[in-house]
Amino acid sequence: RHMEDRILELSKSYSAILLTGPRQSGKTTMLRALSKEENKGREYVSLDDLTTRDMAKNDPALFLQIHKPPVLIDEVQYAPELFTYIKIHIDEHHNPGDFWMTGSQIFRLMRGVQESLAGRVALLHMSPMSQREIIGADCIPFTTNMNVLMDECKKIAPVDTPTIFERIWRGSMPGIVSGLYADRNMYYSSYLSTYVERDVRDISGTVDALKFNRFITAVAARTAQLLNYHALAEDAEIDMVTAKAWVDILETLGIIFLLHPYSNNALKRTIKTPKV
């Protein structure tokens, strides 16, 4: 992934790295591969394991005694109690690269990090694979220089419209792109029922699974359109308050991204309607 060099570079300066992003977007796979590459004996521990999670939540000091740095803590949002103890460790030792963490509930994580680890952690976000990663093209910094962009166009083979739509339908989850899962319909159906519905319940409690599935379908049908809570509420047969709450949840889980309009005026960027 194009982010690999960035993580290794930041690990030379920061004691903690927090990588957020949707589930199954490749966060853990990439960090475990980098752990082998750096060869520091970094331990891997996942808070998806309920026994491990219980210790992290109820006795974070003991957790860090057992799982000594350097350590990779997966799904750290399940135990925000760890952040205070990680802060104490960093303040006492300040060893670059001690803590690598991943999390799939973005805004929920940010609150805990901002309260406890402000200035001590490098925050990174990983989306599913970019088109450049999928085709194996080199990573280049973003630029608006037309000469550079035209040169890049010459390096990448053009594709026809059916191929573009096939890429859209396939999506960019590593499991699909790599061919690990051949049936994409089954993959995405299982993804919704296994991860999304479980995480939604974890965030908001009880949720009507059928209505929420209908809501996700309505949101997906409006990709690249202006966000319209009223229309989404009508399609899912819910009220607008619930529609707004569910949009927030999907954004928190990294399932959707809200693109706010560009404006030199910060206030206008805030109040104008974003696109999904």
Predicted regions mapped to residue ranges:
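Conserved catalytic/switch belt of AAA+ P-loop NTPases
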Residues: 83-107, 111-116
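Conserved lysine of the Walker
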Residues: 27
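P-loop (Walker A) phosphate-binding loop of NTP-binding proteins
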Residues: 22
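Accessory nucleic acid-recognition modules appended to NTPase machines
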Residues: 177-276
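Hydrophobic anchor at the beta1->P-loop junction of P-loop NTPases
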Residues: 19
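Pre-Walker A adenine-sensing motif
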Residues: 1-11
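Hydrophobic positions on the alpha1 helix immediately C-terminal to the Walker A/P-loop
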Residues: 30, 34
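Short regulatory helix/loop adjacent to the ATP-binding pocket of P-loop NTPases
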Residues: 107-123, 135-140
